[in-house]
Structures are given as structure tokens and as C-alpha cells.
């Protein structure tokens, strides 16, 4: 049985959230972002905000570094990096490569296994019909990690992300 690291009540609902454990919210986040990348008509804003809202500060730092080295170009620009689905696939592989390195040094880090092909990932998400709210665990972790007394820039980041998410969700 895993340990719950946060318990909170919002709008009368009791939540138990393993807020920093990427095993809890990681898969949920990737599913949400891959669905948006492949199925949304305008995914760029959400994908560009992804690095700023991850619940784990180490994940935010790594993803910010990966995105700086491999930015998403605007859709329709003709650049190979203008394909949001392919771009996210490449960012996801960068994360997996980092995890593979870390798991050799730290047995607590889970090896993500081999990367699937882009074609397999695209086929999966293009055909996926979610039976639950995509990204629910990820979004709950964001909520649980939101500071009680946020700085104005933190509020602006969250608002920008949630507004962009509303446009594609």
C-alpha cells in the first residue's frame, strides 16, 4: 500500500493525493498532453505551458531544459518541430532517457522501458476514447501542490495554463 502525501477537501470532496510521486500523476499527465497534442486543433498554448505546471520542481526544471533545447515551433510554420504530436513524443523520450540514466544509479527510479515508435504512439492516441477524465490525477496533483499564499507570478502561470487547457479540453 502506498503512502498518501496529501489529504485535502475542496468543494466538500475529500481528496487523497500522492502529490509528488510521478508514478501517481506521470502517466495521467502524459495521456492528457498526448491527447491534446494529437487531437486538439490548437494545442500549442497548453504544450508550451506544460513545463511550468508540473507538480514536481525537478520535473519542471528538466522539462524546461528539454523545451529550451527543443522548442515547439508554431503550428503551420512548416518546421518539423511544428507537429505538436511529434514534438511531445520527442520531449517524452528525453524524459524517458533521463529516467533510464537515473534508474541505473537509484533503484527507486523506475525504468520506463524502451520507447515505442512515433507511429505506435500516434495510432494509440488518435484511436483512444477515454472512459475517464484524461489527466484527472495530474490535475489533482497540480491542485494539491498549489500554494496557500501564491505569488502573483504563480497565479498568472496557473491561470494561463488553465485558460489554455479550457480551450482544448
In which residue ranges do the predicted regions lie?
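Aromatic-rich, lipid-facing transmembrane alpha helices and their immediate juxtamembrane interface loops
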Residues: 2-169
Amino acid at each position: 500500500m502506498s503512502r498518501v502525501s496529501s489529504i485535502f477537501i475542496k468543494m466538500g470532496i475529500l481528496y487523497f493525493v500522492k502529490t509528488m510521486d510521478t508514478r501517481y500523476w506521470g502517466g495521467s499527465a502524459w495521456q492528457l498532453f498526448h491527447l491534446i497534442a494529437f487531437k486538439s486543433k490548437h494545442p500549442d498554448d497548453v504544450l508550451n505551458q506544460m513545463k511550468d505546471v508540473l507538480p514536481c520542481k525537478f520535473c519542471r526544471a528538466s522539462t524546461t531544459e528539454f523545451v529550451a533545447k527543443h522548442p515547439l515551433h508554431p503550428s503551420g510554420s512548416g518546421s518539423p518541430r511544428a507537429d505538436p504530436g511529434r514534438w511531445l513524443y520527442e520531449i517524452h523520450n528525453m524524459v524517458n532517457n533521463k529516467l533510464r540514466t537515473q534508474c541505473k544509479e537509484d533503484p527507486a527510479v523506475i525504468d520506463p522501458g524502451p520507447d515505442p515508435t512515433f507511429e505506435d504512439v500516434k495510432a494509440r492516441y488518435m484511436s483512444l476514447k477515454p472512459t475517464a477524465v484524461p489527466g484527472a490525477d495530474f490535475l489533482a496533483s497540480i491542485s494539491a501542490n498549489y500554494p496557500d499564499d501564491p505569488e502573483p507570478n504563480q497565479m498568472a502561470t496557473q491561470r494561463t495554463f488553465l485558460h489554455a487547457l479550457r480551450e482544448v479540453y
